[in-house]
Structure formats: C-alpha cells, structure tokens
C-alpha cells in the first residue's frame, strides 16, 4: 500500500493540502490543518435525498467532468464487489462504498478527496453534482449497523490544541475516516515521533465499519458521516510536540445531515434501560395506590357516619317514648 493511501485514513498532510484552484493534485488530507473548518457554521447537507436511487454508473454520470477517468474506477469497484455483498447491501450500494475508498493515480484527485473538499465548502450548490452519488453512498452506509460506542483516533501533523479548548462544540462536515488502532498512528510513516502532532480521541456513537466494502480489505476503517457533532472534553500534552484532544460525539439538536430515505436511521436507536422505565412506573403505581386508599378511607368514613346517624335516631326515638 502506498503512503498516500493510508494518509487518507489517518492523518492530515499539510504539504499535500490543495486549494480548489489546483484540482489535479491529490489531496491526501482527510482533515484539513485549518482548524477553522471544524468550527465554521455551514448549511446542512440536504436535498440529495430527493434524487432517485440509481445504479452506480448512472449515479456517477454527473461527476464525469469532475473526476479523471471515473468510468475506469467505477468498473474496478463493481468488479471487486461480490454478488452477495455483506450487510444486505445491493451490488451497487457496496460498490459505491468501494469506489469511495479507491485511490486515483497521481497526480489526479480521488473521489473521496474531491467529495470531502466540496463538503467543507460554504457553497452548497457546488455539492449538487454529487447528489446522485451521495444518495447511493449514504443509502449504503445507513444500512450498515452502527458500531457500539467506542473510541477512535485521527491524527494531524500540526499543533491544533489551542483551537480546541474544553467545551468547544465541533462539527466535522466531511466524511471522516478513523482508526481504532493507536499503533497505526504511531508508525513513523504517518505521524512519526517528532514534530508537532495532534491526536483526536473521539468517542463515537454512529460510526460504520466499511472494511467488508473497502478496496483495501486490510484496513480497519471506521467512517463517520458528514455533520458529526462533538464537544471537546479535555486536552493532554503527554510528550513534547504531542497533543491529544478528547472529543465526545453528541446528537445535534438541528438536522446537519438529511437522512437518505424515509425511515433511515443516522444514529442508533436509544434503548430505555429498566431503571429509566422504573422512574415512570413508580410514580404511576404510587398515584394508583393513593386513589385506592382514598376510596377505602372514604368508604370507612361513610360507614362510620352512617352508624353514627343510625345510633342518633335510635336514642332520639327512645327519648321521645320516655317523654310520652
């Protein structure tokens, strides 16, 4: 595997970060070293869900003038996809994920590179040519079960600690590839052991394992969806020039990413634990008991009242007879 192929998963390489004016050079970074991209307010990713669900070839047709030799890579992705893909995906859905993971030959930029660059742009109209592919790609991703909550890692070859004080709300607008293996990031080929480095430790709740659908089947890649919303929990500086930023994913109050189809679950369903249910059962049981107790007390009081009234009239009658 070439160096730049693994850079796609794990780190940002400042030397390879390109502007939109130089689209013929591969962007190896999946996280830009420009920290402002994490905090800038963007419009939500919406509109693509209205597109029809098309085969991969047709879904990629609007991108033929954007991505070099796209048809060749689409064919590679389809040929590598088994007839019965895992996770109950269709061939085109699985191939859409596989196409995302393929690295274009240099100096041309890959699909993941151009797509993520466009997702981080403020101009959402620039994203429109990707809508048909996004419909297929995200339909495939949401069919893959979310991994249980776990900690994943990403690395940046720059000190970004000052940009992430505790309590800061962070949104990653691109598809974000992470690894569960910290030893991968320690490899000298990627982050290395010297120079400014920032490690992001992220507690994720809706990551997807795409290894069964990846062009690189040896990569344990966890993919986060656009609009991943997080809060900075803490920071750590365990070694010179090494900074660790602890992030915790939260569900945003507003829609940042439109689901690809009606009923699609971007986040795992929250299961109510027994002790939470008990919080509601106990007050209801208590109220029912109060009503029953009140009814019993009322009946007893009524009987006593009736007894007292009966005794009064009996005495009254005896006194009347005595007087007569």
Regions found by a protein language model. Name each.
Residues 153, 181, 232, 273, ...:
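Conserved structural-core and active-site-/substrate-pathway-adjacent residues in large, well-folded domains
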Residues 281-310:
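Alpha-helical transmembrane segments in eukaryotic/viral proteins
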Residues 27-28, 33-74:
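N-terminal-proximal low-complexity accessory segments that begin disordered
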Residues 2-47, 214, 220-229, 233-274, ...:
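Cys-His-centered catalytic/binding microenvironment captured across papain-like cysteine peptidases
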Residues 308-324:
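Extracellular/lumenal N-termini and interhelical loops of multi-pass eukaryotic membrane proteins
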Residues 57-213:
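Internal glycine-rich, Lys/Arg-flanked active-site/core loops of soluble domains
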